[in-house]
Amino acid sequence: MRNNVTELVNSIIGVQTPGSLPDTLSGAHSLQRRISYFDVNWISWNWDNVNVDLNKEVKKSRPLLGEEDDQCMFGWFANNPGWKYYWSVTDNPDPGYKENYSDIGDENAVHGELYFNTYGGLMASVMTTKMVLNAKRQLVVIDTIVVKAICDYVMKYWKKKVNLTTISLYLMLKL
C-alpha cells in the first residue's frame, strides 16, 4: 500500500475514529506512540481560518536563517516523539524577537493540526488558540524556526518528500 494512493485514501476514509488507523498502515514498520521513535510513512494536516493577507506576508518571508535553527528543530523532534501536533503559521516581523505565550494568536496566518501516520479532524478549541493551552497540553514555542527545516528533516531522516513554505511556527505536543 506504500505507493497506492487509492488504497491509502480508502483506508483513511474507512476509519471512524481519528487516530485509530493500524500501526502498520503501509506494511513497513510498526508505530510506537510516545515511546522511542517511529517511522513516518505519511503526514496529514487539517487547517482552518486562513488569513489571506497574512498568508501573503508569510510567503514573502525571509530566507532560511541558518543551520543552527535546523539543529534546534532536529533536537526538538528527537526529544519529543509525539504523533499529533498543533501547528500555527505566523508572520514574525521581527526575527530577533523571542515569541512567548502572550504572542500566540498574533499575526496568525493559518492554524491546524498535524498528524504523523494517521488522520484526525480539527478540535473545536483549535479555532481559539489560547483555549487550547488550557486543555491540558504542553506548549512548546520554537522561536524563528522555519518549516524548511521540517521538510529537510522529513526528507533526510524519514525519506519522505514534503513541500512546505518558509514560516515561523508554534508546535504543541499533545499530552
Curated annotation (Swiss-Prot):
It comes from the Eukaryota. InterPro entries: DUF5341. It comes from Saccharomyces cerevisiae (strain ATCC 204508 / S288c). To yeast YER187w. This is Putative uncharacterized protein YGL262W.
